[in-house]
């Protein structure tokens, strides 16, 4: 992995954060909710965790950044699940 690819992955992660923030502001009107898991964000995060361990890791960075960028109170569980999937697959491959 070269420096260009790493920088592109970081930029895509940040773009994923912005997309997640925009999504959460459009979907949720209340500022903070502790209950409930967003199924769409969970699916995006798990799929991103799978793609991080493949040649499409840049797209995985975009997708796993999506739930991390959501409003406070949203996306925490989804991000942790996606990160756990990514780490599990990394150690399984290692």
Swiss-Prot record:
Membrane topology field: Multi-pass membrane protein
Keywords tagged on the record: Cell membrane, Membrane, Transmembrane, Transmembrane helix
GO cellular component: plasma membrane
Subcellular location: Cell membrane
Superkingdom classification of source: Archaea
TM segment ranges: 1-21, 46-66, 72-92
Pfam families (alphabetical): EhaL (PF09877)
Protein name (database record): Uncharacterized protein MJ0518
Lineage, opening ranks: Archaea, Methanobacteriati, Methanobacteriota, Methanomada group, Methanococci
